[in-house]
Amino acid sequence: SVLNAIRTGYRLIDTAAVYDNEDAVGEAVREAIAEGLCTREALFITSKLWVQDMANTGMAKAGIAASLKKSGLEYFDLYLLHQAMGDYFSAWRALEEAYEAGTLKAIGVSNFYPHVLANFCETVRIKPMVNQVELHPYFAQPAALEAMKHYHVQPEAWAPLGGGRHNPYQDALLRGIADAH
């Protein structure tokens, strides 16, 4: 559970509208604060706008508002477009407005391929601060990293150890690195 994760020291919590757990995340955050485990400011909470809310700016605004309401939070530390689908340019305008209003402290994208990210960054008013992508020792994505570097977009890895598909704990090279550090 999220509350137990906070109890053990986790401070970054990643959720999304499509995960259908924003309400549970918000509840765990409120419980952790009530128990004196942390302050809201000590946590970094990310959520994501799903594609059904990316048809236009109005739907994206409603999606952001719904995420905030479900979670019971006043703001998200980071809010992402979950994928480059739908009218993600119009949806981005809603993120820009919420960022400027302070309800989204940082805004970014997720799963944007290098050519999509490049076109996006050349077009939008506020560049994404993060691109959350699959990134791990078995899928290094050098072209994606180069595009992010060029546009000053911070990469954030999902499945940073390979998502369990690659058995990284049995990988001799990774075990050697772990043992050395």
Residue ranges, per PLM feature:
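Short, acidic/polar
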Residues: 1-6, 55-71, 88-90, 115-119, ...
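N-terminal binding-site loop/beta-alpha segment at the start of enzyme catalytic domains
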Residues: 1-43, 61, 161
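Active-site acidic short loop of glycosyltransferases
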Residues: 7, 40, 73-74, 104, ...
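Glycine-centered flexible beta-alpha turn that most often forms the glycine-rich phosphate-binding loop
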Residues: 13, 76, 107
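Short, well-ordered amphipathic alpha-helices
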Residues: 24-34, 64-68, 95-96, 117-118
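A short, structured active-site edge motif that brings together acidic residues
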Residues: 39-53, 77-84, 111
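CE4/NodB-like, metal-dependent polysaccharide N-deacetylase domain
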Residues: 59-80, 97-101
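Beta/alpha (TIM)-barrel catalytic core signal, keyed to glycine-rich beta->alpha loops juxtaposed to Asp/Glu
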Residues: 83-181
